[in-house]
């Protein structure tokens, strides 16, 4: 079992290498259909399994196509990772779509809408309080 510090260092190295592969190494056109970036790598304590979280910018169809391309390129990515990173055993690689940025944007828009509604209600309350009673 590797130490937490080593796991974090290896995960960061894997993230950097896979990001470079996405930019220049993977020839599958499906991977290029949406703008892809590696957001996180979750590496198991024994360094045998790596979950690669990717953020894909584009339409829903482009996202599905890009994920299919990444799943098809998993073998190549693992092989190339074995050449680039010196480990006793190359970890099994699984690509997962990270939608946290999208969810964060939705939450922010909801908060902004609530803030606007509260401001409107406060303005209406002030106007009602200022009206002279007849």
From Swiss-Prot:
GO terms for cellular component: cytosol. PROSITE patterns: RBFA (PS01319). It comes from the Bacteria. GO terms for biological process: maturation of SSU-rRNA. One of its GO terms (molecular function) is ribosomal small subunit binding. Keywords: Cytoplasm, Ribosome biogenesis. It is found in: Cytoplasm. One of several proteins that assist in the late maturation steps of the functional core of the 30S ribosomal subunit. Associates with free 30S ribosomal subunits (but not with 30S subunits that are part of 70S ribosomes or polysomes). Required for efficient processing of 16S rRNA. May interact with the 5'-terminal helix region of 16S rRNA. Monomer. Binds 30S ribosomal subunits, but not 50S ribosomal subunits or 70S ribosomes. This is Ribosome-binding factor A. It comes from Cyanothece sp. (strain PCC 7425 / ATCC 29141). The gene is rbfA.
